[in-house]
Regions:
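Acidic, Ser/Pro/Thr-rich low-complexity regulatory regions
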Residues: 1-153
């Protein structure tokens, strides 16, 4: 590792991790990874309509990771440490990516989830250097999990 995290970066990292353990956010994260599959903005609005429990779960998950990635993008967190210990954000980005442009248009927000997007782009490069094939395997796993969820429904 070229540089070590500072004490302050490590403290903030632990605070962000502690938020992740909060019961309501854990519930939202559980819902998100079991239920959120959308290939378009319209489908996303059917899966997680605004002003519903599902919509609240969705917003809790993406806003949590958007905030964490903003801290990362502004240099408040140590990138290697974050990437080594927080890969979940990439899974969240992979789930919302197909619907993000439609959402940005619908809400006239070109920057909606842009911190998550920027961090995910860097993470993909970072992890592929260290573990070639990881992203493809993760995408295949998600595809298979989605197919199993459809069959179970």
């Amino acid at each position: 590792m070229d540089n070590k995290p500072t004490f302050e970066q490590a403290q903030l990292h632990l605070q962000i991790f502690e938020q992740r353990r909060e019961a309501r956010l854990r519930q939202a994260r559980d819902w998100f990874f079991k239920n959120y599959y959308a290939d378009s903005f319209e489908e996303a609005m059917r899966v997680a309509p605004m002003m519903t429990e599902a919509g609240t779960n969705w917003m809790m998950v993406v806003s949590y990771w958007e905030q964490a990635c903003a801290f990362l993008n502004y240099g408040l967190l140590h990138e290697d440490l974050f990437f080594e210990t927080s890969g979940e954000f990439f899974g969240v980005w992979e789930r919302v990516k197909p619907s993000i442009e439609g959402g940005r248009k619908a809400f006239s927000s070109k920057t909606f989830l842009s911190n998550l997007e920027k961090a995910a782009e860097r993470y993909e490069t970072w992890i592929e250097k260290r573990s070639p094939g990881h992203v493809a395997a993760m995408r295949e796993w998600t595809k298979n999990f989605r197919e199993q969820a459809k069959k179970a429904a």
